């Protein structure tokens, strides 16, 4: 069958830069699904995306669907004809649906009976007849949160559409996409190259767009080029560029013909904390800051223009002129904020609500102060410094700098606290209280910082759960999932001796009578244990391993971590599978039995050698394992328990647990209960698959 390259390009107004890549990838995935559903063979699908276009190029696409044989089984012969041999209504209705008469139907004969059968060869449709509908379907399924209408049309898309091009090889595919008829004309760069030109063959794309339209349509090519040029520009300045992937992606999505330029600002602005300057350069202007080899911010920045200008200095001057007022604002705010102490902002916190039912930010500050001190005492951190950090924790939210540059919260608190002469670990905690901010982010570095970070997160969890506003589905307006996982990561990775139950109880107690959910403590603990499950799954731990540990409901995160790792190691032992199966068998036996068990095994009632041997082993192991359990050495404990395999196997091979003698039966059930209890000190390994 003949194959050709298929091209579709949708020319638009400027698409949302933060969504551009995801739109293009979804377009490709959706169209691949359309091709699969249509039973069309195809090769590689390449996607292209610029601010003003989305495009797909499909290699080796079949010109038509393959012919296929269709079989439709009808009613059984007994139901298809009446006693006179005439077709029944059921048979006639089925035949009509197949486009034949009942008399024209074939017969399907099997060992189970005889049925009417329709068999036909369906000729595959030409791909040219299908492509427009498939493109429309793929576009309609794109994840676009807000759709736009334009002109007087009912069509909706992320941005107004101006051109559509669909080519199968050199043949134009006629059709209407998003209200626009397909044509050979595509548009070039707004200010360079040819504004419009015709494309003759799908194979010419994207090279023709680069040559005639001065547009680099390949997203990855643009991204790599920008990164390389920014790095080289920084080297020429004698520094290193701050190239975060998120900013690089956004800049790539903003330009069609990237030209990297360098600019500068006055040295005096470097007296302002670097974080504030970087915030406005990266967040507002999409510039790349530059640092010297010592990690200090330089008075230079790198930006990407969307034009190859004959006078680049004019573009540089324009960008320097734009950024200067923003940096001057930061300088003014910094100087103004330092005219009073950070602590002087406390009364203003009373004017800002944390949550209507939970009080103001000042109320939250008081709770965090108390909880941070309580946590600090538990983990051996400086209690006075922790309570001081708690008191100052939200004061920077009232400063001019944070009001204008919101993402500098925390870090500006740190700088202002240092200016006020606060202890260094207090100042550092004001910045680190929000860590970890995202997956893989660094954790607070000191005990005081850990105490404050956990206190802030637990106060939010207790409060929001306490008024019944826990996350539902994808909705999590208070970022409780992130708060829970952040607290857990700190406790686990810093190996802090904190218990979720008592920690939550203390956080709840500090709210007084504000909370309406009587089950708030249990709800928060269960929620956090649920985040454990998700976190460990993401790290590659098996679901049944996590469930085996969760069955014991350990509320100390560090203890939970030790158990998961111990069970994971246990699974590598040769004895693991047999002992897991034995525990499952024991669980089933005990669940079905109705007898009341003894407090302990009666040695005098033991008869069979195998049960005597098992009981003896358990007595020895109980003494040996006690200190291991006490110290949380679960891996060593499970290795010791693995030695029971042969004894347990021999017991089940030779001993009848449900003996007719009630005393013997109860004693054996008690023995099995003691066996299971030893494993349950770590996890319910009967749940292992």
From Swiss-Prot:
Transmembrane segments: none annotated. One of its GO terms (cellular component) is cytosol. It catalyses: tRNA(Gly) + glycine + ATP = glycyl-tRNA(Gly) + AMP + diphosphate. Its main location: cytoplasm. GO terms for biological process: arginyl-tRNA aminoacylation; glycyl-tRNA aminoacylation. GO terms for molecular function: arginine-tRNA ligase activity; ATP binding; glycine-tRNA ligase activity. Its EC number is 6.1.1.14. Pfam families: DALR_1, tRNA_synt_2f. Keywords: Aminoacyl-tRNA synthetase, ATP-binding, Cytoplasm, Ligase, Nucleotide-binding, Protein biosynthesis. It is found in: Cytoplasm. PANTHER family: GLYCINE--TRNA LIGASE, CHLOROPLASTIC_MITOCHONDRIAL 2 (PTHR30075:SF2), GLYCYL-TRNA SYNTHETASE (PTHR30075). Belongs to the class-II aminoacyl-tRNA synthetase family. This is Glycine--tRNA ligase beta subunit. It comes from Photorhabdus laumondii subsp. laumondii (strain DSM 15139 / CIP 105565 / TT01).
């Amino acid at each position: 069958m003949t194959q050709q390259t298929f091209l579709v390009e949708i020319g638009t107004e400027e698409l949302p830069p933060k969504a551009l890549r995801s739109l293009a990838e979804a377009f490709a995935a959706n169209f691949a699904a359309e091709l699969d559903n249509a039973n069309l063979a195809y090769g590689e699908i390449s996607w292209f995306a610029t601010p003003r276009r989305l495009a797909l190029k499909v290699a080796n696409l079949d010109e038509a669907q393959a012919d296929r044989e269709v079989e439709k089984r009808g009613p059984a012969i007994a139901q298809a004809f009446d006693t006179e041999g005439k077709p029944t209504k059921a048979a006639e209705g089925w035949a009509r649906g197949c486009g034949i008469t009942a008399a024209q139907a074939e017969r399907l004969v099997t060992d189970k009976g005889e049925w009417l059968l329709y068999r036909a060869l369906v000729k595959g449709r030409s791909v040219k007849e299908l492509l427009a509908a498939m493109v429309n379907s793929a576009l309609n399924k794109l994840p676009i949160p807000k759709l736009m209408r334009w002109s007087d049309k009912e069509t909706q898309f992320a941005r107004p559409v101006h051109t559509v091009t669909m080519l199968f090889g050199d043949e134009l595919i006629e059709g209407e996409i998003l209200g626009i008829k397909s044509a050979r004309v595509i548009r070039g760069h707004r200010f360079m190259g040819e504004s419009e030109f015709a494309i003759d063959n799908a194979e010419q794309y994207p090279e023709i767009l680069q040559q005639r339209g001065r547009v680099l349509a390949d997203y990855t090519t643009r991204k790599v080029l920008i990164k390389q040029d920014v790095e080289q520009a920084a080297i020429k300045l004698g520094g290193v560029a701050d190239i975060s992937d998120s900013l690089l992606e956004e800049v790539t999505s903003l330009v069609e013909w990237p030209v990297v330029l360098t600019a500068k600002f006055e040295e005096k602005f470097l007296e302002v904390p670097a974080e504030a300057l970087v915030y406005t350069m990266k967040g507002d202007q999409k510039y790349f800051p530059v640092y010297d080899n010592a990690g200090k911010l330089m008075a230079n920045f790198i930006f990407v223009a969307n034009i190859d200008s004959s006078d680049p200095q004019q573009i540089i001057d324009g960008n320097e002129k734009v950024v200067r007022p923003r940096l001057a604002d930061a300088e003014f705010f910094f100087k103004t904020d330092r005219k009073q102490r950070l602590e002087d902002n406390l009364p203003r916190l009373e004017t800002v609500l944390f949550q209507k039912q939970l009080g103001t930010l000042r109320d939250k500050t008081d709770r965090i102060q108390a909880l941070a001190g309580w946590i600090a005492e538990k983990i051996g951190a400086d209690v006075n410094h922790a309570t001081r950090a708690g008191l100052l924790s939200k004061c920077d939210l009232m400063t001019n700098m944070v009001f204008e540059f919101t993402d500098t919260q925390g870090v500006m608190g740190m700088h202002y606290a240092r200016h006020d002469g606060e202890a260094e670990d207090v100042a550092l905690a004001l910045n680190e209280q929000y860590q970890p901010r995202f997956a893989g982010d660094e954790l607070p570095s000191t005990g005081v910082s850990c105490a404050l970070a956990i206190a802030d997160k637990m106060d939010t969890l207790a409060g929001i759960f306490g008024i019944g506003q826990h996350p539902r589905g994808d909705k999590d307006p208070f970022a409780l999932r992130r708060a829970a996982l952040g607290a857990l990561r700190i406790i686990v990775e810093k190996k802090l001796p904190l218990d979720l139950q008592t920690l939550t109880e203390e956080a709840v107690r500090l709210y007084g009578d504000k909370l309406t959910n009587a089950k708030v403590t249990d709800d928060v603990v269960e929620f956090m244990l649920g985040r454990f499950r998700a976190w460990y799954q993401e790290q590659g731990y098996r679901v049944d391993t996590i469930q085996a540990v969760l069955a014991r409901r350990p509320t100390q995160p560090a203890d939970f971590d030790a158990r998961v790792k111990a069970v994971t190691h246990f699974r590598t032992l040769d004895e693991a599978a047999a002992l897991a199966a034995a525990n499952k068998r024991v669980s089933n036996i005990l669940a079905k039995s109705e007898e009341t068990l003894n407090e302990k095994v009666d040695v005098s009632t033991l008869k069979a050698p195998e049960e005597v041997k098992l009981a003896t082993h358990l007595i020895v192991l109980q003494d040996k394992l006690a200190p291991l359990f006490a110290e949380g050495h679960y891996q060593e404990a499970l290795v010791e328990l693995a030695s029971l395999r042969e004894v347990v196997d021999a017991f089940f091979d030779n001993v009848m647990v449900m003996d007719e003698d009630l005393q013997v039966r109860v004693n054996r059930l008690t023995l099995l209960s003691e066996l299971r209890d030893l494993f349950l000190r770590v996890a319910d390994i009967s749940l292992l698959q």
